Amino acid sequence: MTETPTAQPDRAADADTPQHRYTAELAGQIEGAWQQTWAVEGTFNVPNPVGELAPPDGTVPADKMFVQDMFPYPSGEGLHVGHPLGYIATDVYARYYRMTGRNVLHALGFDAFGLPAEQYAVQTGTHPRTRTEANIVNFRRQLGRLGLGHDTRRSFSTTDVDFYTWTQWIFLQIYNAWFDRDANRARPIAELIGEFESGVRTLDDGRPWSELSAGERADVVDSYRLVYRADSMVNWCPGLGTVLANEEVTADGRSDRGNFPVFRKRLRQWMMRITAYSDRLLEDLEVLDWPDKVKTMQRNWIGRSTGASVQFGTDAGDIEVFTTRPDTLFGATYLVLAPEHPLVEQLAAEQWPDDVDGRWTFGATTPREAVAAYRASIAAKSDLERQENKTKTGAFLGAYATNPANGQQVPIFIADYVLIGYGTGAIMAVPGHDQRDWEFAHEFGLPVVEVISGGDISEAAYAGDGLLVNSDYLDGLDVAAAKAAITDRLVADGRGRARVEYKLRDWLFARQRYWGEPFPIVYDSDGRPHPLPESALPVELPDVPDYSPVLFDPDDADSEPNPPLNKATDWVHVELDLGDGLQTYTRDTNVMPQWAGSSWYELRYTDPLNKEALCAKENEAYWMGPQPAEHGPDDPGGVDLYVGGVEHAVLHLLYSRFWHKVLYDLGHVSSREPYRRLVNQGYIQAFAYTDSRGSYVPAAEVVERDGKFWFEGAEVFQEFGKIGKSLKNSVSPDEICDNYGADTLRVYEMSMGPLEASRPWATKDVVGAHRFLQRVWRLVVDEQSGAVRVANHEALDTDTLRALHRTVAGVSEDYAALRNNTAAAKLIEYTNHLTKEGVTARAAIEPLVLMVAPLAPHLAEELWRRLGHDTSLAHGPFPVADPQYLVTDTVEYPVQVNGKVRSRITVDADAGKDTLEAAALADEKVQAFLNGATPKKVIVVPGRLVNLVV
């Protein structure tokens, strides 16, 4: 980046370089050799209690640990230096605990299905599978260079048939289950059918089960399933040819992938009933060792609120409204429905009432025309856009509803700030006490009634507490009492009930694409879905020559999805015997969303070779089962440490928790949560540069001169942000490994700052980590001769003993707490001490090599071997601190004169007040400030300070 050459180690030794110096070339040779040794010896392979990975005698260590990374999507660009941050951190953690004797499971797979691979394939004409497999090979090569201690037998890709067989199997378990609200858990659908057949459970309409036709029974059962089809409002993206989950749509109503317009459209789609688990998903956040930020994000996403359901009567039937403020019902002066509400068509009148306010008509000649025009005007808006603070818009339906509190007729509008996905898709508008309603009322000339005293509703809505007014029998009550009283009255009148509502919506679980897991579902000639038997799995994704999605004009909101699998006609139409003879069925041509594989992959790491089950119960219980003795009586179980980016706080983590809880309810796993502990790593950021047009230029070719930055002779402008291909500031880990070695990259990334914090990348600073490793090397190896320079029987002086054991204690604590940056700092300090004092004693240097091993494993293994050991240090032992050397002999005290620190003194740790006072008065700096004066008072605070008052 600068015109001044950056210091880099020579890849090959020149004439002036000692023959046995730790150079980039030597580092590369050492790293390659040890990676091969680890692979051949299976150094990081860990045993399972049962199955193919079990030892012959079936015994496994009781002290296990399961460490997991959020697995990568194998993109075509490969890794940049920001990607390995979390992988290296977990490797350091796993290596440390492995050296302390723990049986550590650490493996890494690939999340390879989904839109990115398909989009790239469409652009290049390469089949998604071909490109994905090539990308995985490159990722494995790049990750392999880093020396990550993974059990490679447990690696997989979500696109492997052996993996997605079990994704389909889990789908069938969820499909063939229902949520028993009385038991607050999922149960097999067969048990529900048994209850209907026995009469234990009856139909809501009172019909006997025996009188229902087969089709009617199927409809009832399907309405209970945890997976169901529904006509629902979805996010349709014509430019991608698929529907998207809410989480895949940006705030400005465009697709996160490709930046295409997204439209709200009603389609029949597969849904997963995640809302049934809302309370449990909330409650179990309390027992998880997760960042508070992530817990808050999940709580907000689930969005639990308590209130009342209120029925407003209309000519088209009752409109159900959910409100958290039933106490304000007397102040409801109009209703607003989401434009997509199913009653809109029935309510919209043929003509406007006499003397209708022109502001209410949306410029249309009839209410029905107003509805059509208004819907068209908001079709491309995202939910967030619809709720932004702006001028309120809407249209009157030409219809009225009856307020159940006072019997008054109130007009009914549609408006975009009411969403069909929350509550009932209808609100009672109380403009006196809700600011959005107040703004809408002022825009449309609607009445504003005060029902809570304490504010000036002529200026703005009053949302505070107060006593009820203008509310009949509620007058004089406080808000809490009024809520209870009005809810009781609504229940008594049959016009409402107490209710809990959630923002969380059921999970849209289908995509109209090619590159995803096929559904194990077929349809009969009547269009009724049937789950395939488990024996029919896997349903393999067919190889088709035309896998591109059916795309539309990005602005064509009226287009309809046409999944690419429809083109595979030989695959789509299949003859099966599902219990009633051989019949022709049609396969479901949607595929699962990209979140499917990542919603359960932690379980497959525990038993990746099992062909008979998702994972053996013994293996899941060993690696993920609850451990009340270690983690407390309410331990939910799960992976011991999960590390990944905070961007997955809601989607992936919420979906995986949902799937795991269903599997727990059905008895397939012993843990009720997938991840016991979560840590979000920060990001590695870097400078990027733009020219006068705002276009990014290659950061590696920018030079700095006189405080300005130049590219090809023209001035460019520096900015700071993420590393990436689009910003042209990407740095490949291959480049750093080539120029310094993988161990240097590991040490540099770990020493840049706390794991959770983002940090700036600076290639010019990498050399500092390399020089540290060179100093460690020189403590063991003579650079001139290559001989080991360690003395076997040299005794350690007291200072070195203290430095050693304090380093061991501090580094152990730091590794366990993922404070790798401070661990590195302590190791550098100890290395400097040994170098400065010329220590060559084996007793001082071998512990250093062991402590360095989690950070720089290749170097440590090589030094360990040169020190005469014939086994790997990967399994320890990690040094243990001797407590006698951790005692502090001296203490430093600040000395204040009239409250300001003027000096510092060092005294024995057990020094008394008299000694402290004498030492403070004898200090030269203090004497200078006293200038011969005698202090009026000396205040000694043991362990903290000395203050002289003059």
Swiss-Prot record:
The keyword Aminoacyl-tRNA synthetase applies. It catalyses: tRNA(Leu) + L-leucine + ATP = L-leucyl-tRNA(Leu) + AMP + diphosphate. Pfam families: Anticodon_1, tRNA-synt_1_2, tRNA-synt_1g. The keyword Cytoplasm applies. A motif ('KMSKS' region) lies at residues 722-726. GO terms for molecular function: aminoacyl-tRNA deacylase activity; ATP binding; leucine-tRNA ligase activity. A motif ('HIGH' region) lies at residues 72-83. GO terms for biological process: leucyl-tRNA aminoacylation. InterPro entries: aa-tRNA-synth_I_CS, Leu-tRNA-ligase, Leu_tRNA-synth_edit, M/V/L/I-tRNA-synth_anticd-bd, Methionyl/Leucyl_tRNA_Synth, Rossmann-like_a/b/a_fold, tRNAsynth_Ia_anticodon-bd, Val/Leu/Ile-tRNA-synth_edit. Its main location: cytoplasm. GO terms for cellular component: cytosol. Its EC number is 6.1.1.4. PROSITE patterns: AA_TRNA_LIGASE_I (PS00178). Keywords: Aminoacyl-tRNA synthetase, ATP-binding, Cytoplasm, Ligase, Nucleotide-binding, Protein biosynthesis. ATP binds at K725. It is found in: Cytoplasm. HAMAP family: Leu_tRNA_synth_B (MF_00049_B). Belongs to the class-I aminoacyl-tRNA synthetase family. This is Leucine--tRNA ligase. It comes from Mycobacterium sp. (strain KMS). The lineage of its organism: Bacteria, Bacillati, Actinomycetota, Actinomycetes, Mycobacteriales. The gene is leuS.
